[in-house]
């Protein structure tokens, strides 16, 4: 079981980051709310991970702290929620925002996330609310929004294409992802900025 990585960031391709540890490169899938806080390529990062084994793949999911990882692990226990959908949920909302939405029973906020319909949102509220009762010490303080900051990244010529690809990887349809990015696109924005603003606008 791989629970934590400490190494140098080799490449950032949202929502994937490649981290080299002891000469081995690990591909880690990260929610965009965690991805924003990563240092730039060439710098050291510490990532808490959850290892998922499927018939066709072995995948690492990464988080900036244990609380985010705990929430991810609880999410994938919910009926109908797999790692990909959990990643999309925590990309559209920070962990704290998701906890708040569940505790306030905000179905309307949850259904705006990719892959979440009304029934899934209601199921998440019912199942996760019960689990939060025993997890508060290991999660977050209710009703306090988590403020995220991210290092500035230089804009690239293909920032829009990277942003669209990342949104598709998170569960949005290609046409929908393109439309989301085109609405907020600007020439001086990095792909990370475009992804963050597109997700924020969708909510």
Swiss-Prot record:
Main location: cytoplasm
Location(s), subcellular: Cytoplasm
Entry's family note: Belongs to the RuvA family.
DNA-binding as UniProt keyword: yes
Protein name: Holliday junction branch migration complex subunit RuvA
KW Nuclease (keyword) present: no
Family annotation (SMART domains): HhH1 (SM00278)
Gene Ontology MF annotations: ATP binding; four-way junction DNA binding; four-way junction helicase activity
Organism of derivation: Shigella sonnei (strain Ss046)
Subunit structure: Homotetramer. Forms an RuvA(8)-RuvB(12)-Holliday junction (HJ) complex. HJ DNA is sandwiched between 2 RuvA tetramers; dsDNA enters through RuvA and exits via RuvB. An RuvB hexamer assembles on each DNA strand where it exits the tetramer. Each RuvB hexamer is contacted by two RuvA subunits (via domain III) on 2 adjacent RuvB subunits; this complex drives branch migration. In the full resolvosome a probable DNA-RuvA(4)-RuvB(12)-RuvC(2) complex forms which resolves the HJ.
Region (Domain II): 65-142
Residue segments, region Flexible linker: 143-154
Source domain of life: Bacteria
GO cellular component, one term: Holliday junction resolvase complex
Protein task: The RuvA-RuvB-RuvC complex processes Holliday junction (HJ) DNA during genetic recombination and DNA repair, while the RuvA-RuvB complex plays an important role in the rescue of blocked DNA replication forks via replication fork reversal (RFR). RuvA specifically binds to HJ cruciform DNA, conferring on it an open structure. The RuvB hexamer acts as an ATP-dependent pump, pulling dsDNA into and through the RuvAB complex. HJ branch migration allows RuvC to scan DNA until it finds its consensus sequence, where it cleaves and resolves the cruciform DNA.
